[in-house]
Amino acid sequence: MPVSLAVCETANVVNAALRESLGSGIGGGGGCVAAAASRSSAGSGSGSVAGVDEAKIGDVSGTDNLQSQIVANAKRVLLAKIEYEEVENYHESVLAKLKSKYIVIKPDNNNGAANCNYKTNGKAVGSNGHDNNTVNGGTVNGNRKQTVDSGQSNQNSSANPNELPKPKRVLYPRENIRIGWKQSERKWQVGAGMLNVGNTCYLNSTLQALFHIPALANWLVSETSHVENCNISESCGSGGCIICAMAKTLQTTQSNQSAVRPFLIYTKLRQICKHMVVGRQEDAHEFLRFLVEAMEKAYLMRFRNFKELDQLVKETTPISQIFGGYLRSEVRCLSCNHVSITFQHFQDLLLDIRKADTLEEAFDGYFSRERLEDMGYKCEGCKKKVSATKQFSLERAPITLCIQLKRFSMMGNKLTKQISFKPRIDLSRFAARSPTAAAQPLSYRLVSMVTHLGVSQHCGHYTAIGLTEAGSYYNFDDSYVKPIAMQSVCNTNAYIMFYELDVANSSSSSTINNNSSSSSNNSVAPKLNGLRLSNGAHSPAAATVAVAATATSTSASAVSPRFIGPQLPNGYANSNGHALGGAKTTIQFKTTPQKQLQQQQQQQNGLLMGANKFQESSQSKHSLAGTLHKGEAAPNANTNANANKSSCNNNITSQHQQQHILPISSDEDEDEDDSDDDDDDDDDDVKANTAPQLPSMPKMFEDSESVAQTAKLKPKTPLKSLVPYESASEEEQEQQQQQQQQQLLQTPQQLAANPRKRRSGSDSSESEEEAPPPLPSILRNGHAKTNGSVSNTSNSSHSKAKSASNASSANVNSSKQKTDAIDEIFKSLNNYKNKHRIAADDDEDGDGDGDGHGNEQVQTEQGTKKLNSASSASASKSNGWQSQNGKAPSSPKTPPSPAVIKSKTGIWQITRTNDDDDEEDEEEDDVEADADQEDDDDEVVVVEEPQVSVTPKNPKNPFAASKSAEANATIAGAKRQKLLNGSAKSAATTRPGNGYQSESVANGSAVSELLKQNHRGYGTSVLSWNGKPSELDKESFDLVCAKRIAGHGDTDVHSDVNSSSNNSSNINSNSNSNSNGNGKRKNSTLLAEAREQRKRDAEDEEENEMDRGRQRKVKSASVKSNNSTPGYNPFQEFENQKRWHSNKSGTFPRFYHQNNRPNFQQRNKFKFNRFGGGAKFQQQRALQRHLAAGGGFTRRQQQSTGQQQQQQQQQQQS
């Protein structure tokens, strides 16, 4: 057995040998070293002559004799009997001193300590992870005596390297930290402000944030004895003690009513950090870190041998106990799954906010598992570099959590994004998977914070926000102190945040957790300033129970959603956390005898649980307090069960008397054919809802979106409301689409029975001509109007009316009403496609073949015809409004259309017209009238009021005021339609496609072509068609005919002018007869006006027309205008021809022109003229304003180009 001997050092051994050999001859009177040596060798004490002679001889060999004497005496000392005591594990104790300076990474698998005699019994660990038990005589002031068996305590930690190592000495116990303002005996004030003495806002804000941390403030106030007897300033020089300066500054802010100067801290700035300069702006977080470090050093200087303390002991200072915590780092090898566990001490968490918008997201990113660089980690198990993953977790959470948001980069730039946070946070989901970590409270509340206003690290302004004892927050802006609301605090651009353990929440949760342990084991967990913590105990049994009781509840809360609000202890918990005897609203389902038995079993836990509707089953649902995972055993399961039964059974009767029951449809599949039977079943189940609900009341029986996802209900019929809602949310719109999709999937046979009718929009009844349907229903908000809905059954309207008041009447005649509802949907959609046309339609409506071709097109183009609701013509007139009697399903975002629409152009009334109103259609289409009666029944037309004259809008200025049609006096009550290229074409004429395939069907019209072109400019008026300018509506019909003669050279023009009122007429005019009747003089005047009009159109077209880059630009003038190639664009062709082959300022081509400035201005008119422009641009703007005000055209004499003159000569000759 190794023995430790109390052997002196070499110098002590030599001195002892000299004193023993020379001490006997000192009193003999010799005094010299040689004489003493000779006397010692001779053994004689006399001073005879013979002695002197011997002394002379001894001078020769004095050195050798002295050395031999020293060796002899040292040997005699070593051979002397020495008392000693045996020390166990001497070898291990020496190694333990070395191991205390390092962290064990890999556990020692082999039993190397098998030959050593040491104990491996576990000990109860306190809340700070330290061994509170004493070995030889107890503790003094929380510190262990030096007689503690260090080998045994260190070997206890080395036996389980996955646990946090314990220090050999605790400088300041964690239990002495007082959390919260209420733990102090004094009354805390709001605190005075601090004067800014020159760019010291960072210092003032940091001090204010620290002074409003209750744990730190209570500790600084408790250091009064140290402040009075501090001698650190004498030993350190002129620097002084930082802790004393902080304590004095805190007392000054509490005692003064006006702003104070923190000169005690400001004068020690160089002592806190050497590179900080007085009067220069510094970073608040950097100053905070150096200030906390200086306070730790000042506390360690109280101990004489503080330099010899190891790192674990230095981390037990009061500053580290308040701000310090430990992170558990787990690195897992992806090859051999070897896990390396290390522990890191931290005093603040630096969160990256580049990919986070909230504080919770930043925490998730910090504690998430990250992948190390490929082949960059050397595994201890594989002994090679492999890929690994790393993850942090909280092994020991600090009392005060300091969070810094990484808002600044290395270059000083600031990330000024808003990070939302809450005043209370819970970090239990980030706790490590260890009993000690799971047992600690991790509920925090915001106590103070530092904010930064500015765009850079080196500029801006710092302010602080602190929580006072009264529970309100105050803003500290240097010397200004003012209260701030909670909402403003959460919307602040925070930089540094301080969260402290919440005493109230922790005490309630710890009381719940300790209830069971105290009942079965008569032991009490240690108090933390009135707060009974469950993560530490003085006995091993109590610690074990506390850990077992709280670890399960914490893990259960991580899986199930945590309950918000105060919680009652076991035995007093009510169902769903409500107060005892309080009224609550629950939901009652249709029950069967089996379900009643199941509910009775579920109510034993105080929870009224539905059948897979709103709550989980009792087998998988975790209760709010005291629950355990599967496979885990509670230490007092019987006690908890009896407590829950007794508390819940006593209050079940009183609770059920105050419950308000709401009806809801059952999840059972009921196929009932009679509504009376259904109503009888509902009367039995629905007790509270005896009176029918009003139609305008919101339906309480409609399933919400979350319920519809979990419930397995088969929708019988769509819910219908008597009162349509004017608007709907996006969730309801999605729910409506889901219901329609479910209906389509559940009835494939019924839909496939008549696909032609369903796709063409015909009614479900076959006798369409004999029995026309009543007013159609308009689907809004997922409900269908019941007044006038199509149904083959006689009692369908009554059953639908009942469905608005009863929850279960929606199951009546499910198969029939499914088909009717689907037919109504497709019928209304198809009617909207076919019948809601513009009143100013092309000449097909007047021809005899128009209705027939329109009906054929519905059948031939079932899936290809698209709905163009955002066209330029329809947007200016209808603007999404629909008639109240129409079949079109209005958008859930738009209100129902009124009877009369008031616009800038007049009053527009939407009425219903039949084919009887159109006299010419009756004469020409007697055979086809009956077949097309259904298609033309609901046609929406625009009716002109007799008092207000309605004219089409000006294509150049849609918002211009209407001008009285003086030239149209000969055509009374008729509204002239825009001519397509100045001539009317038949229905069978093909149109150019503008990048699309040309339509060869008879339904193609000028309006449909305009609808196709409406993507150019996104709804702006189309000013040209087929490469030629369009005519104005304000000019007379004769002028239009003359312009057609001058511009297009058409000899025979058939113009169809359709009226939007009850009477319509067709006008066939011959341009040759009109021109001959008016005379040559009138014809020349009209030609001149037509030429100038075409010039103005050509000039204004380039400015008003926008090219979105959707069409390929073809710079070729040889392509004919009537080309029907799919890629041909007449608009772009005209634009290219005008841009490349014309010149606005002269008759010469652009490349022959000598002056380049006008061409430059013309090419860049959009770039420069919009913001100031030139004279030409101002003239054009003035003309547009003149036209918008209702005025006529001005006469502008402009020189025509060479191409225009040649074109005019050719037209005159023809």
UniProtKB/Swiss-Prot annotation:
UniProt EC number: 3.4.19.12
Q: Name one GO molecular function term.
A: K63-linked deubiquitinase activity
Q: Where is the composition biased (Polar residues)?
A: 144-161, 856-868, 983-1001
Q: Which PROSITE patterns match?
A: USP_1 (PS00972), USP_2 (PS00973), USP_3 (PS50235)
| Catalytic activity from the UniProt record | Thiol-dependent hydrolysis of ester, thioester, amide, peptide and isopeptide bonds formed by the C-terminal Gly of ubiquitin (a 76-residue protein attached to proteins as an intracellular targeting signal)
Q: Which InterPro entries does the UniProt record give?
A: Papain-like_cys_pep_sf, Peptidase_C19, Peptidase_C19_UCH, USP_CS, USP_dom
Question: Compositional bias (Basic and acidic residues) spans?
Answer: 1089-1098
* Ranges of Low complexity composition bias in the record: 132-143, 509-523, 633-651, 735-751, 785-816, 869-878, 1058-1076, 1178-1188, 1197-1214
Q: Where is this region: Disordered?
A: 124-169, 509-532, 631-819, 836-964, 977-1001, 1048-1161, 1176-1214
Gene3D superfamilies, alphabetically?
Cysteine proteinases
Segment forming the signal sequence: none
One cellular-component annotation, GO = nucleolus
Relate the assembly described in the record. Interacts with atms/PAF1, but not with CycT.
Q: What does this protein do?
A: Required for maintaining multiple types of adult stem cells, including male and female germline, epithelial follicle cell and intestinal stem cells. May function as a transcriptional repressor by continually deubiquiting histone H2B at the promoters of genes critical for cellular differentiation, thereby preventing histone H3 'Lys-4' trimethylation (H3K4). Controls selective autophagy activation by ubiquitinated proteins.
Protein's recorded name:
Ubiquitin carboxyl-terminal hydrolase 36
Native species = Drosophila virilis (Fruit fly)
